Amino acid sequence: MADGALPTMSLKGKVSEAEWQARVDLAALYRLVALHGWDDMIFTHISARIPGPEHHFLINPYGMFFGEITASSLVKVDLEGNVIDKTPYYINPAGFTIHSAVHAAREDAHYVMHLHSDQGVAVSAHKEGLLPLTQHSLIVLPQLAYHDYEGIALNLEERERIVADLGQKKLLMLRNHGTLSVGATAAECWLGMFFLERACAQQVMALSIGRDNVLLAPEAAQDEVRKQIGMGMGMIGGLAWPGCLRKLDRESPGYAD
């Protein structure tokens, strides 16, 4: 167990191999977000669908910091918000609203990540949204959609609008709120968010010198990048993911407990 992690009974060997792997990968995502400083204490969430017809998914125990989360501490719920297995923890209602919406609507959305980073929230509140300023932004823009702010996501009726605005894209800017990434794998979900968060940070820094002083990427270059990334984040993410896990093993061990 990692230093500082809350005590949790290990579920290894007590759940299916598929569920255990989803738990380990999801716990890794939480730890990676914490390592990059993109967490917001207990107030954002990442989820993973468990393979199987039940459409159960895993999400963080409400009250646990991202750097404390382990594979065994994650909470399993159904699409109605019912906790499936006995646990001392419960879940964030706003997290359930957002994540249940995407998991129910998108079969390819095995992992869903929602963050409130400073740079992500800042760009979500910018009237022009994410601008084609950098290579990072050009990579994510073709997969980026927008959802207008409706208040804290406690209204279950908002789920339909979140899903409609996301459509078949992989990334969503929640206006005045934050960012969201979906992926068929933990690696794809992570890499999409990594590029989006980097693009947002770069935009905030660039605009600090004034909107009139920044140079947008030429239209031809934007089109070229769109063609070049046709292979998607899945393959690239698969190449980067093992290195991410090695970094966790060095700097945040215990996530797979």
Curated annotation (Swiss-Prot):
Coiled coil: none annotated. Keywords: Metal-binding, Zinc. The keyword Acetylation does not apply. The keyword DNA-binding does not apply. Belongs to the aldolase class II family. GO terms for molecular function: actin filament binding; metal ion binding. PANTHER family: ADDUCIN (PTHR10672), PROTEIN HU-LI TAI SHAO (PTHR10672:SF3). It comes from the Bacteria. GO terms for cellular component: cytoskeleton. Binds 1 zinc ion per subunit. This is Putative aldolase class 2 protein CC_1201. It comes from Caulobacter vibrioides (strain ATCC 19089 / CIP 103742 / CB 15). Its cofactor is Zn(2+). SUPFAM superfamilies: AraD/HMP-PK domain-like (SSF53639). Zn(2+) binds at residues 114, 116, 177.
